[in-house]
Amino acid sequence: MPLFALGINHQTASVALREKVAFSADLLLDAYQALLAQPTVLEAVIVSTCNRTEIYCHLKQDNCDEVIKWLCSFHQIEDHKLRPSLYCYSEYQAIQHLFRVSCGLDSLVLGEPQILGQIKQAFATAKQAKGVDKIVQKWFQHTFTVAKRVRTETQIGANAISVAFAAVCLAKQIFSDLSQSRVLLIGAGETIELVGKYLIEHQVPNITIANRTLSRAMALVEQFDAQAITLGEIPNHLAQADIIISSTASPLPIIGKGMVERALKARRNRPMLFIDIAVPRDIEAEVSELRDIYLYSVDDLQGIIEENKQARQVAALEAEKIIDGCIVDFISWIESLKAVESIRTYRQNSEQLRDDLLNRASAALQNGEEAENVLKELAFKLTNKLIHHPSLALNETARSGNDDELILLRNALGLSKKD
């Protein structure tokens, strides 16, 4: 039952190559139609993110050359340009790879949770495209169970290891319920956008975005249902903010001690948290001298991040142990399918034998033969035919001298040691 995981990721391929092999959402259904039309492809799921493009598939044969050729053809890229960056795992390694990817163990940021959501979406799209049947369905269901176990039983996602995530986690430590907090974000770059996404995940209802140009801020306003202001308007809004997170490219501080003093007075000294993740700093260091002010710099966050990286490495080792056990469980299920097929065939053969003998017996009765004789002959022939192959197997096994196999065969036939 050949299972494969093939593709490229941030570890094996440049951004330029990953862009060429990425599947845009509007082309995915066409891609599935073409992929599933390949003679050897039984089932397939395409996972395409900014950091990886992978195909998880169930094939008729024991190599994935046809899928690789299709991938090159679909994206119009020459084979020799893709192969050096391509990995192709089969069976145990393929199962392990999907489990590790879903748990964030193969991500650029160790343990990041977004990849699981992306895999779930990819699986849903594959089902929509008729790319999923029994084997891949079970594979991915098992994958989601593994990822849930890893998240529940380890601390893989509990410790922030990105500046943006660390900033939000720090805010949550100081203001335990962020859903009651007002947040001012200063800047509109990638880091602030990521901070905004994490804040939304924590149900922060009131976000204001301050930026030098309103046009860039407006893009985030729509994304986060926020309010936009210019940097010059910050003094008028600062007192309303409980949490201020700043990340701009300004060469000079944007917030000074005097501005914060006035805001504190207007707030009647209710605490304020300032997180400055800009270099050079956006907030004057003297702000930390004020009472009821918590000021953290990017260096403070880096210290937290380094500690958390070590904690995640420990959690990753625990996750690998869980994954190893789950691989064994899934492979056992796959192996059990072989028995299911054998049982089905054995039953079909037995039923066919029964039907043939019944038809002969019925014909004999219609020809006027004695019912008792017909039944005796039916029972005799049925018994002989049913025990014929097991008897041959017992004889051959006994002659081979393989006692373990003989015991196994006897147990399968329901024979006790005394028989």
Swiss-Prot record:
Keywords: NADP, Oxidoreductase, Porphyrin biosynthesis
MF annotations from Gene Ontology: glutamyl-tRNA reductase activity; NADP binding
Pfam family, one: GlutR_N
This protein's pathway: Porphyrin-containing compound metabolism; protoporphyrin-IX biosynthesis; 5-aminolevulinate from L-glutamyl-tRNA(Glu): step 1/2
Catalytic activity, reaction form: (S)-4-amino-5-oxopentanoate + tRNA(Glu) + NADP(+) = L-glutamyl-tRNA(Glu) + NADPH + H(+)
Coiled-coil stretches noted in the UniProt entry, renumbered to this chain: none
Documented EC number(s): 1.2.1.70
Gene Ontology terms describing biological process: protoporphyrinogen IX biosynthetic process from glutamate
Keyword flag NADP: yes
Residues at which NADP(+) binds: 187-192
Major enzyme class: oxidoreductase
Entry keyword NADP: yes
Sequence positions that bind substrate: 49-52, 107, 112-114, 118
Domain of life: Bacteria
Annotated site (Important for activity): 97
Residues forming the catalytic site: 50 (nucleophile)
Additional note from the record: During catalysis, the active site Cys acts as a nucleophile attacking the alpha-carbonyl group of tRNA-bound glutamate with the formation of a thioester intermediate between enzyme and glutamate, and the concomitant release of tRNA(Glu). The thioester intermediate is finally reduced by direct hydride transfer from NADPH, to form the product GSA.
Oligomer and partners: Homodimer.
Family: Belongs to the glutamyl-tRNA reductase family.
Function description: Catalyzes the NADPH-dependent reduction of glutamyl-tRNA(Glu) to glutamate 1-semialdehyde (GSA).
Domain notes: Possesses an unusual extended V-shaped dimeric structure with each monomer consisting of three distinct domains arranged along a curved 'spinal' alpha-helix. The N-terminal catalytic domain specifically recognizes the glutamate moiety of the substrate. The second domain is the NADPH-binding domain, and the third C-terminal domain is responsible for dimerization.
Name used for this protein in its record: Glutamyl-tRNA reductase
Gene name as annotated: hemA
